[in-house]
Amino acid sequence: GGDADVVLTYGRPGDVILVGDWDGDGTDTFAVRRGNTYHVKNSMRGGDADAVFHYGRENDAVMVGDWDGNGTDTFAVRRAATYHVKNSLRGGDADTVFTYGRAADITLAGDWDGDGRDTFTVRRGATYHVSNSLRGGAPDTVVTFGRAGDEVHVGDWDGNGTDTLGVRRPVGPAPVAKEVRSAAK
């Protein structure tokens, strides 16, 4: 409980909010995506963006990660099963393009092997196909974890520098209280 440490206004209603360490200072801040335009902020204050650029297409799925291990987060966009990875906060061509998984897969980004570089895992139901490099082909590891309907989160839960999976499982509908009264006359 209690009051927030920081309250700020940034972006517009309908913007997609993204979080990352854009300038490598060790602090995550916000970026907003409006279509294929990114507005990146390096501080927890409102006002103008520190960087504005176009990347990818409006309907691309976007992921945030430190793809090259330099300490700064940038964007990758996914189009079907093809990934377009950018290592700078600028428009233009991707630095790396590859196909991995299937178009219907769910993609998760994380540093799965603790080398300081984020890569992708694709999820099919409760099966995860983990790649430790930005390339197509066979996964480095295949793991079954949780259930197909679980909500999945990625994090370094124990502080060892390696991301792993965590799941949140809905426990079903909220209990319903029903009071039954007899109609006494």
Predicted regions, residues:
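Trp/Gly-enriched beta-strand/coil motifs that build multi-repeat beta-propeller-like domains
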Residues: 1-185
